[in-house]
């Protein structure tokens, strides 16, 4: 299927201050967005796609000046694809605190004339949803046909159905969780510690020093990436294969240089990530992950937390995802069923772990395609 082709982001400016869950206020902020497809006359065919930790507004298509800049969910969104832009108007929003153009730690603090750095206020999933609602308002969209996301994006989709129940017809929540486990919070803490202990971090003010805490950011990404892959997938891709600079494939070099293919892969992923991502943003987003827990205000009762939702739901998980295991998705399903909500659930047998939600798997894509066909029939798309 064809890509949506050349796309261009747009920057939306908001003068009305946004009060955050922490009590801090952000004024005069901007959000970078991309849109695909056409909004129909009734404004009933809009779909919001929420991004995960290291992604952005650039969901699909390519930029004219960089043919390699394919959107992070290009296999999912586009003409004739599961989320068909011939039928739906799709919006991608770069969240507050990110490093791809929306107001965040790299932005200039008007009170100092310098980047916010670590002084940028902590944000939450709920803060992002409120900011996204203002984007919807700017487009004149009163109700989304669907809000969709995977991983952290799925948390935002779920939060939308809780916070703006009358504005979400369908919630599509993929490879996600109603809250992080202690183990997941621990992974995030180790990743943050790697960044905070990097001498180049400078208390978050590394911009003024002309450096980036790349060593810490690289380790943080390596830790995260391990959790995104399944044991079987890593065994299939790498096993215990050696990668020696001298070409030898069957002998150790008895040093601490890279020897195994999996080591080489993780270092490559870490280096690539450290080149384009911002360390302060990584700290912010992982903390937003930690804080997400809609049942907290209901004494941990997820059924009570979801009692006032109105959307219909598609919840999907992957068999080998151990970061956000299928059991976590089933918690959401049970709470929704307890509230007699309309829920479709699928656990897809896929070998690729948590990252499976980003990949082109026929069973997975057929599921999403069929669900959007149902939505299209409802809204006349």
Swiss-Prot record:
Pfam family membership, one: Abhydrolase_1
GO (cellular component) term, any one: cytoplasm
Reactions it catalyzes: L-homoserine + succinyl-CoA = O-succinyl-L-homoserine + CoA
Occurrences of domain AB hydrolase-1 (ranges): 45-360
Domain of life assignment: Bacteria
Enzyme Commission designation: 2.3.1.46
Active-site residue numbers: 151, 321, 354
Residue sites binding substrate per the record: 221, 355
Compartments (UniProt record): Cytoplasm
GO BP annotation list: homoserine metabolic process; methionine biosynthetic process
A molecular function (GO) term: homoserine O-acetyltransferase activity
Pathway entry: Amino-acid biosynthesis; L-methionine biosynthesis via de novo pathway; O-succinyl-L-homoserine from L-homoserine: step 1/1
Coarse class of the protein's main subcellular location: cytoplasm
InterPro entries assigned to the protein according to its UniProt record, in alphabetical order: AB_hydrolase_1, AB_hydrolase_fold, HAT_MetX-like
Function field: Transfers a succinyl group from succinyl-CoA to L-homoserine, forming succinyl-L-homoserine.
Family from the record: Belongs to the AB hydrolase superfamily. MetX family.
NCBIfam families xrefs: homoserO_Ac_trn, PRK00175.1
The name this protein goes by in its record: Homoserine O-succinyltransferase
Organism: Burkholderia cenocepacia (strain ATCC BAA-245 / DSM 16553 / LMG 16656 / NCTC 13227 / J2315 / CF5610) (Burkholderia cepacia (strain J2315))
Originating gene: metXS
